[in-house]
Structure formats: structure tokens, C-alpha cells
Amino acid sequence: MSITAERKAEVIQGNANKAGDTGSPEVQVAILSERIVNLTAHFKTHTKDNHSRRGLLKLVSTRRSLLDYVKKKDEARYKALLEKHNIRR
């Protein structure tokens, strides 16, 4: 359900604005998107796992808040994020 340290490092490297960037909204959205995809796959086999489903909803809410922040600051970055991570809006 969680992502490995190696996979997380790959996601960070692929979305960082500069070297050592781990806290920008783009990186945070990328990490959350990766975790959401993993949890979604988990629910295909564990349909009654409501405890984890609540965690998924919290992740989606956090990602939504970050996306709203990026949209408020820079519309072009927001659209690029949606397209890069296949997020429906």
C-alpha cells in the first residue's frame, strides 16, 4: 500500500524543480498520486477494507488542497500537473 523508498526517490527526482527539491507542491502532488494509485489497486482485491478507504479519502483531499494552491498561484503549472499525473478535474 505504501511506496518504497526507491520509488519515492524516483518520483521526487522526476518532479523536482531543482536538485534537493522535496517540498514543492509538484513533488507533493506526485507522491500523493503515486500512493493513491497504489491504494486504488489494493481496493480491487480488498473491497471491504474501509479503514484504508478512509486513508485514501484523506490523501485525495490533501492532494486536492495542494492542487487548489497551485491553481491559485500559477494556472499553467496546475494544468501541467493535471496532465502529467492523469488527474481528472
Curated annotation (Swiss-Prot):
GO terms for biological process: translation. InterPro entries: Ribosomal_uS15, Ribosomal_uS15_bac-type, uS15_NS1_RNA-bd_sf. Keywords: Ribonucleoprotein, Ribosomal protein, RNA-binding, rRNA-binding. GO terms for cellular component: cytosolic small ribosomal subunit. Residues 1-24 are annotated as: Disordered. Residues 1-10 have a biased composition (Basic and acidic residues). The keyword Manganese does not apply. One of its GO terms (molecular function) is rRNA binding. One of the primary rRNA binding proteins, it binds directly to 16S rRNA where it helps nucleate assembly of the platform of the 30S subunit by binding and bridging several RNA helices of the 16S rRNA. Part of the 30S ribosomal subunit. Forms a bridge to the 50S subunit in the 70S ribosome, contacting the 23S rRNA. Belongs to the universal ribosomal protein uS15 family. This is Small ribosomal subunit protein uS15. It comes from Rhodopseudomonas palustris (strain BisB5). The lineage of its organism: Bacteria, Pseudomonadati, Pseudomonadota, Alphaproteobacteria, Hyphomicrobiales. The gene is rpsO.
